[in-house]
């Protein structure tokens, strides 16, 4: 069985209003959005947390494996971004948080990512937390919402509203940029990382 999902929005850094994932003004560095300390479980069944990302830029998104619409292209796009950043010599870790953690066990996440061409050398798919916890982190840190609803048919038993952005976080855990996860620009991400590195 599969589940339906729908995109949610992230607050605009300039107006305080919600904007969709294709918005051009994606610099949120002045807003001091910070990722709280965490230790979850990765696709290998091993602990992985914020301490493993200290001093590194990382790109985060929110997905679930039963999603039939936005998550497959997001995951494929993340794989493409991963390849392009490596070609450009830009070091960025990738982190995908499941918004369906009860179902998305480590082996489920690993098989899903493999199907979409993931390289696990710097891509970490996380689970091992409650829905309540990831919902709170998404709301408090990324100013977006996760909402589970009953599905519309036996084939779609679950509907999940979740963000479709890719979020760039710096080595201190501060969210500095976001991008449209359905149409990401790897060249722009690489340019932003290079610029932010120079500004350290």
Question: Can you describe what each PLM-predicted range is?
Answer:
Residues 6-9:
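Bacterial signal peptide processing site
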Residues 17-51, 76:
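N-terminal "domain-start" segment that seeds a small globular fold
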Residues 35-36, 58, 163-164:
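Short loop/turn microsegments at loop-to-beta-strand junctions
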Residues 61, 94-98, 165-169:
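Soluble periplasmic/extracytoplasmic beta-strand elements of cell-envelope proteins
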Residues 130-192:
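Thiol/disulfide oxidoreductase modules built on the thioredoxin-like
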